[in-house]
Amino acid sequence: MPKLRSATSTEGRNMAGARALWRATGVKDNDFGKPIIAIANSFTQFVPGHVHLKDMGSLVAGAIEEAGGIAKEFNTIAVDDGIAMGHGGMLYSLPSRELIADSVEYMVNAHCADALVCISNCDKITPGMLMAALRLNIPVVFVSGGPMEAGKTKLSDKLIKLDLVDAMVAAADSSVSDEDSAKIERSACPTCGSCSGMFTANSMNCLTEALGLSLPGNGSMLATHADRRELFLEAGRRVMALTKRYYEKDDASALPRNIASFKAFENAMALDIAMGGSSNTVLHLLAAAQEADVAFTMDDIDRMSRQVPHLCKVAPSTAKYHMEDVHRAGGVMGILGELDRAGLLHTDVPHVAADAGGNLKSVLAKYDVMQTQDDNVKQFFMAGPAGIPTTKAFSQDCRWPSLDDDRREGCIRSREFAFSQEGGLAVLSGNLADNGCIVKTAGVDESNLTFTGSARVYESQDDAVAGILGGEVVAGDVVVIRYEGPKGGPGMQEMLYPTSYLKSRGLGKACALITDGRFSGGTSGLSIGHVSPEAAAGGTIALIENGDRIEIDIPKRSIKLAVSDAELAARRETMLARGPMAWKPLSRQRYVSMALKAYAMLATSADKGAVRDRSKLED
């Protein structure tokens, strides 16, 4: 029978000092011997997705203590990618994922906690905590802050739905008046919560449901809705149930590495492809798989992208649906139910929402709105927006008049009526990306599935933005932004501003954009990222010259630089002749801090999840 990890610091005469300190935190005589559950909270006033999380740890703690545990809360950092976007702050976003993972590991192992609840929400916080949870392999439940309500405003007497990207595009569009731009800005982000579309934060919170590590509704229930309170309470109760199963019954199925197996990663990727999730999810799933020692790779993603249909279309891929609409249609469980009926889901895998001995099949039987007989579940998925600006969690209890169970023309479709029979993400490869690259096909217009154009090369995102706004980029160009990968940036910046500015200039369907950086979940259009190897690691993207022809064929999963092998070999020799300046941008002026240099020293390319290169850390 496994011994409580916390016994290391609570048992024996030699631990008198440690017990004295535990007592100073409120632990009583009769508490010693109970499991100590760590609560990793990511509350911060910097981030709308986290601004309402201050008291959530106390909610979870109350449920843990009522179930017989000791709850101890700590905090992690949280970067807002939207606020960090478009300037040097974005260099810190992806590296913060590793810091979050490390900090959770440090706190949990330093204090010998027995189990963990992760309160996360936004872009790098959920992935960082996920990496830590799989690294630690102690009982864990994830519960996020939930999505924000979609913005709404009237323009030209027409009510429209909005999100963050709309504000960015409108601000850069000279045809939009100052008055309308300000109106959109003030309406785009009305409440607390993660941005309202299927951007990275919401994508990752949905994927934790599919991995089996969070409760039904975690990814889609609005941050403002009163029903979300129960998710926090149940997270506390569930982590205690998992803790007892492992430590008292020696049930290893309660551990995250046994829940998040290869099959579970396939389920998560199937969901991601079906819902057209952010391309960043590929990066984070690959990183999490490495922490779990699961051999899930880009090859698996490529294989699945050819098999799984696109069943759910959400902003930024459409203006019609946001996360509140996904929830009304049954949330993640609704999409998983359709994947199951299509024969594309493993249902024989454990799940934190299942009782001992149960699995995803039993969870779907209760929570898939197309098969459940539970009226409470149906009411749960009818939770809707109030349309009242607020930073308070659980501040409203509005409900839709009915569920969206239209699987032919609704937000979630059956396989027969899928938005497309191939999924919302694709892996492309060719001589421009030997180890692959990613495109969010859910956001690509059918007319752009094949594209050939002339390269317009930039050595940084800043130069690309200046070029787009300055009129250098014209219809038919393929904008190439390089040296923005994990090493080259360093930090692998998101390219939301370049793609937004292409749209605002009327070039959204007339140009393509290729980068060894990455894209915001808010990106749509022919935007191809994660080019691997990156420029700084000797990738072919570093050898592209202005005017080179680039051929993109998404149906064939191909991306090709139409330059002969002999010419590429000559360019590579020229690059190597630069000595210490090889594989570096010649003209870019960018301050890189010691912290970012340390990150870059160990960072791998995107095809490995941009995690640390373990080979450099082995004895």
Curated annotation (Swiss-Prot):
MF term (GO), any: 2 iron, 2 sulfur cluster binding
Textual note on the cofactor: Binds 1 [2Fe-2S] cluster per subunit. This cluster acts as a Lewis acid cofactor.
Positions of Mg(2+) binding: D81, D123, K124, E494
GO cellular component, one term: cytosol
Residues the record lists as N6-carboxylysine modifications: K124
Keyword Disulfide bond among record annotations: no
UniProt keyword Heme present: no
Binding residue positions for [2Fe-2S] cluster: C122, C195
Required cofactor names: [2Fe-2S] cluster; Mg(2+)
Keywords: 2Fe-2S, Amino-acid biosynthesis, Branched-chain amino acid biosynthesis, Iron, Iron-sulfur, Lyase, Magnesium, Metal-binding
Catalytic reactions on record: (2R)-2,3-dihydroxy-3-methylbutanoate = 3-methyl-2-oxobutanoate + H2O; (2R,3R)-2,3-dihydroxy-3-methylpentanoate = (S)-3-methyl-2-oxopentanoate + H2O
Pathway assigned in UniProt: Amino-acid biosynthesis; L-isoleucine biosynthesis; L-isoleucine from 2-oxobutanoate: step 3/4; Amino-acid biosynthesis; L-valine biosynthesis; L-valine from pyruvate: step 3/4
Function: Functions in the biosynthesis of branched-chain amino acids. Catalyzes the dehydration of (2R,3R)-2,3-dihydroxy-3-methylpentanoate (2,3-dihydroxy-3-methylvalerate) into 2-oxo-3-methylpentanoate (2-oxo-3-methylvalerate) and of (2R)-2,3-dihydroxy-3-methylbutanoate (2,3-dihydroxyisovalerate) into 2-oxo-3-methylbutanoate (2-oxoisovalerate), the penultimate precursor to L-isoleucine and L-valine, respectively.
PANTHER family, alphabetized: D-XYLONATE DEHYDRATASE, D-XYLONATE DEHYDRATASE YAGF-RELATED
Assembly and interaction partners: Homodimer.
Family membership: Belongs to the IlvD/Edd family.
Name the record gives this protein: Dihydroxy-acid dehydratase
UniProt organism field: Shewanella sp. (strain MR-4)
Gene: ilvD
